[in-house]
Amino acid sequence: VLDYLEEKGMLENTMIVYTSDQGFYMGEHGWFDKRFMYEESFRTPLLVRLPGGKKGDVAELVQNIDYGPTILDLAGIQKPEEMQGESFLPLLKGEKAPEWRKSLYYHFYEYPAEHMVCRHFGVRTDRYKLIHYYNDIDSWELFDLQEDPSEMNNLYGKPGTEEITKELKAELKRLQEYYDDPIRKEFVIE
């Protein structure tokens, strides 16, 4: 594809995106699937070649809901007001994006279904992740992704985690409100 674009003189006028809709477990956490909020499924590959773009990594938290706004921005089209997500074009250009997000929201609700994955929602920051399993259970998980990148040590309820848990729950409530997730009315976070 790259050779063709270069041959036709289109390479320097084309944004190339390689991505996926989700990651996948290959035995991690005893799972062979997707759906849970653990990093193996939550993180997705995203490679972007932008003519004149910055080479290297982007450390900011980007979601697949940002793809549309980014492509519209590149085309010079303003995103519709009702469209979720933000353009990460400034990040690709090596610029500082104004007021970039500090957290990501996740919600899996297809239960019961053939996969039998418990309903859960959560919030992830650059360092921490808080997950709440709900419906027929009420269970929480808290992970320090710097100290435990494999998410094997649940810190929820452990001494010394009270403040970060409180902050993450407040952020979780804020994100549920921001995305207008109806679950916030059924399962109120305390």
Residue ranges and their predicted role:
Residues 1, 67, 168-171:
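Alpha-helical packing segments of well-folded alpha/beta enzyme cores
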Residues 2-53, 63:
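Histidine-centered active-site microenvironments of extracellular/periplasmic hydrolases
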Residues 5, 150-161:
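Active-site-proximal N-terminal segment of extracellular/periplasmic enzymes that hydrolyze or transfer
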Residues 6, 10, 93-96, 160:
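Residue-level signal for alpha-helix termini/capping positions
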Residues 22-28, 49, 54, 65-68, ...:
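C-terminal cap/loop subdomain of S1 sulfatases and analogous C-terminal strand-loop tails that border
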Residues 38, 59, 79-81:
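Short, surface-exposed helix-loop/turn micro-motifs enriched in polar/charged residues
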Residues 55-58, 153:
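A generic structural signal for short coil/turn motifs at secondary-structure boundaries
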